[in-house]
Amino acid sequence: MTKRALISVSDKAGIVEFAQELKKLGWDIISTGGTKVTLDNAGVDTIAIDDVTGFPEMMDGRVKTLHPNIHGGLLARRDLHSHLQAAKDNNIELIDLVVVNLYPFKETILKPDVTYADAVENIDIGGPSMLRSAAKNHASVTVVVDPADYAVVLDELSANGETTYETRQRLAAKVYRHTASYDALIAEYFTAQVGETKPEKLTLTYDLKQPMRYGENPQQDADFYQKGLPTAYSIASAKQLNGKELSFNNIRDADAAIRIIRDFKDRPTVVALKHMNPCGIGQADDIETAWDYAYEADPVSIFGGIVVLNREVDAATAKKMHGVFLEIIIAPSYTDEALEILTTKKKNLRILELPFDAQDASEAEAEYTGVVGGLLVQNQDVVKESPADWQVVTKRQPTDTEVTALEFAWKAVKYVKSNGIIVTNDHMTLGVGPGQTNRVASVRIAIDQAKGRLDGAVLASDAFFPFADNVEEIAKAGIKAIIQPGGSVRDQESIEAADKYGLTMIFTGVRHFRH
């Protein structure tokens, strides 16, 4: 009996060659719509789908393959006489191979001018139905959803006259991943359209971006996946211009650096980062000087770190960075001369290009954190804050210079691991106290790191001071201005201590924990 294949694809890559090889092997080919036209024009003889169903395509192609003659031919178990007899009694011919890929729903909704009607029309119904039917009956039917699998299928058919069960099972699993991902994108789109923020079912889909050598440690297996609907400012969207593949830890650090730089759009800024904590942030009127400040903030910790810049890298800045061992440099662009400088004798230096300012982060954009057996979902911490809403709670008002420095410090401390403290002036970080289990310890670390540079310095805390001992330490160091959220039941004790030492202190009313 002649074997039959059903081919209906939106992605025509390689399909003519695939179909030609099937014909050489003696297969009949059923086809639909544009796929049939493509194959017929290439000289590949095909059978029209309506010749199989006895029913014309209708409703602009919405109904063409949803028919017992198709799904019966796919689902009939070859090992059950009753199934084969039912097919014979109803004049249903068996289908042994299905090659289908789906309407481009993802590509459609990514278009900036997409309409709701366009999105709906690009939801495939018949394609997923055929794929699922064929995949369910993978004991007998081969199903292909990815052109990358054409070669292995042809190789096995040529060698054995059929595919192996292992191949059919693997391809079936791929189909179910594919259709699940397809439906997840549709669900995500419709959920957003109706404004549902707390759906009872959360469906997320990600595409494999990069298999990794290992994870956080060498004994951990790992892979990097990109969101099904890519985010413009994500590390997953960066273009790598030089260097080795990014490691697991590289990606996490780079992500943290990109999050930080988004808050510093108004002036040229450089962020240096290690272990997901900023070790240096510099801001100036030009990117070269901003680099100088970021480097001077902590020339020890920057060694082996990640640097992200929010302006084009020029030759002068590149020369300075070239002299420092860095793992990664991220910037929106590089001059040709800068790129030549950075890559000279630095084949392993990872240089990334990312227009991360193309889109502001939105509070509505969810952030996911995995726990054992569960997933925490929250909005990103990108609330718009205005200094006009801040409250000076001490007797002394801050000077204009202090206000500028406090605004800078408040942006910077948001990305320090809690308990997070940062000491800055108006253009660079001076000391960072991250991740201590008590706040006064973080205060001491930040101050110790800033020693010798505390004249005119200010201090920011990501959360309130639970006790006045923090203010005591700050005053003892000679720092005269503090910014913190406030909100402790002992706020008054901290205010009184600040007044006692002539400090100025601002309450923002917004906490920025980062675990």
From Swiss-Prot:
Catalytic activity field: (6R)-10-formyltetrahydrofolate + 5-amino-1-(5-phospho-beta-D-ribosyl)imidazole-4-carboxamide = 5-formamido-1-(5-phospho-D-ribosyl)imidazole-4-carboxamide + (6S)-5,6,7,8-tetrahydrofolate; IMP + H2O = 5-formamido-1-(5-phospho-D-ribosyl)imidazole-4-carboxamide
Pathway where this protein functions: Purine metabolism; IMP biosynthesis via de novo pathway; 5-formamido-1-(5-phospho-D-ribosyl)imidazole-4-carboxamide from 5-amino-1-(5-phospho-D-ribosyl)imidazole-4-carboxamide (10-formyl THF route): step 1/1; Purine metabolism; IMP biosynthesis via de novo pathway; IMP from 5-formamido-1-(5-phospho-D-ribosyl)imidazole-4-carboxamide: step 1/1
Keyword annotations from UniProtKB, A to Z: Hydrolase, Multifunctional enzyme, Purine biosynthesis, Transferase
Alphabetical GO biological process terms: 'de novo' IMP biosynthetic process
Lineage top rank: taxon: Bacteria
Gene Ontology, cellular component aspect: cytosol
SMART domains linked to this entry: AICARFT_IMPCHas, MGS
EC number: 2.1.2.3, 3.5.4.10
Classification via InterPro entries: AICAR_Tfase_dup_dom_sf, Cytidine_deaminase-like, MGS-like_dom, MGS-like_dom_sf, PurH-like
Family recorded in the similarity comment: Belongs to the PurH family.
Cited PANTHER family: BIFUNCTIONAL PURINE BIOSYNTHESIS PROTEIN ATIC, BIFUNCTIONAL PURINE BIOSYNTHESIS PROTEIN PURH
Record text about domains: The IMP cyclohydrolase activity resides in the N-terminal region.
Annotated protein name in UniProt: Bifunctional purine biosynthesis protein PurH
Organism: Streptococcus thermophilus (strain ATCC BAA-491 / LMD-9)
Gene that encodes it: purH
